[in-house]
Amino acid sequence: MLAQLTISNFAIVRELEIDFHSGMTVITGETGAGKSIAIDALGLCLGGRAEADMVRTGAARADLCARFSLKDTPAALRWLEENQLEDGHECLLRRVISSDGRSRGFINGTAVPLSQLRELGQLLIQIHGQHAHQLLTKPEHQKFLLDGYANETSLLQEMTARYQLWHQSCRDLAHHQQLSQERAARAELLQYQLKELNEFNPQPGEFEQIDEEYKRLANSGQLLTTSQNALALMADGEDANLQSQLYTAKQLVSELIGMDSKLSGVLDMLEEATIQIAEASDELRHYCDRLDLDPNRLFELEQRISKQISLARKHHVSPEALPQYYQSLLEEQQQLDDQADSQETLALAVTKHHQQALEIARALHQQRQQYAEELAQLITDSMHALSMPHGQFTIDVKFDEHHLGADGADRIEFRVTTNPGQPMQPIAKVASGGELSRIALAIQVITARKMETPALIFDEVDVGISGPTAAVVGKLLRQLGESTQVMCVTHLPQVAGCGHQHYFVSKETDGAMTETHMQSLNKKARLQELARLLGGSEVTRNTLANAKELLAA
């Protein structure tokens, strides 16, 4: 419930503080006094668009604050808790507008984006403007009103989720198809590159291995000759070799040891050298025996190495890196093949998600049909009460799967006849301005009863209504005020007389500046204001008597 509205330096208001109560509050005033200023200020607290000229002339900024009691608003309390903005069972929505047009929003003293003001505002209050009857002719608004009356959000939420999933699947498939030409060109190039590489099939570490083998084979003649020369020096030479010389040396040292035992260590070293020379000689003999002098193998290696160097140069990599590069091309080719397969998967996902969205849309269609009949009958009854005794109202709900959107696949059309013998036609083609206003008001009152919003504002929605019809409208709003906080800006005494509270808006000027005031009326002042509304500027006994009748009704 809206508990208080504080306005500072807004439009022609310098300072204003208004306390609101439960029930129906009416706001009246002379033409041009600014009856809707409080509603405009509240709209800004709820995240409405701000302009620089909204700031009072001469002031640096306008400051607007709306205080709400959250006693019976669990949805708003949950929203505040989820956004970590809760502060007990009250909520302050504040808007500060600078003279340069910039503005800031606050919830319970914390700066927030305007989108959050709007989100929370929708849970706290609904504003029905004087042009609501114009919206009534628009199909999308008709759908909004029907869904608002149904007040069944689960299917709508699921419909939105399913539609978004389908829409994302369509975008994914379109993006995939858009890139398919690029992938096809790349796949063709890869196929050309891999044809030669597949035939060669480079293996990791192979180049280093065959390069070493090639060097060995290429130098095998020199390796054999040099190895044999070394072997001759160590053991196989006929004239002299290290083994025979060591043998002679050992004999001489043995004779010396007989004369001096200190030389026994020298003999040990010569024995060890003899063993080392023998082992080295054996190893060198085995090496010579194993040495491959196959010229065919040498040619094969030379061709393999030459081809790998050529391919590496062609692909701008080193010969050693060619196997890794080859593997990367194979992996990329596999990815492209997988992506080609994924197009079919994406297409299947589009079909699947579309069918799921249509399934929810059909369920939503059935729900709307059910509530459309119920709402149409209530509106028909209200039309009869609002001086349209022959009025009939229907709501057509047509399913069109080609019209699938986030809110389903229904085309909603409000149809009406106001005179006997006339066929049902779209509401925009049949109803006059006054009739449209009455029908719009009836719908707003009926749908408001079903919604959970704890406060409702009707800003001159009774335009085009007068006499007995106005009295019916006043009673409808008062009945609504028994269960919901209702605020109504009106110029009709029949409506104003139905309020539980009454505020009067006036303005005064000193010749240089104009200022708007708003005051709560006691019973006596209220009689005077109702009499003014009934008779114009002159209050007479008759108008006062009529005013008393309105208050007593």
UniProtKB/Swiss-Prot annotation:
Function, in words: May be involved in recombinational repair of damaged DNA.
Stated induction or repression of this protein's expression: Induced by hydroxyurea.
UniProt protein name: DNA repair protein RecN
Localization of this protein: Cytoplasm
Keywords tagged on the record: ATP-binding, Cytoplasm, DNA damage, DNA repair, Nucleotide-binding
Keyword 4Fe-4S: no
Gene Ontology CC annotation, any one: bacterial nucleoid
One of the protein's GO biological processes: DNA damage response
Pfam families reported for this sequence: SMC_N
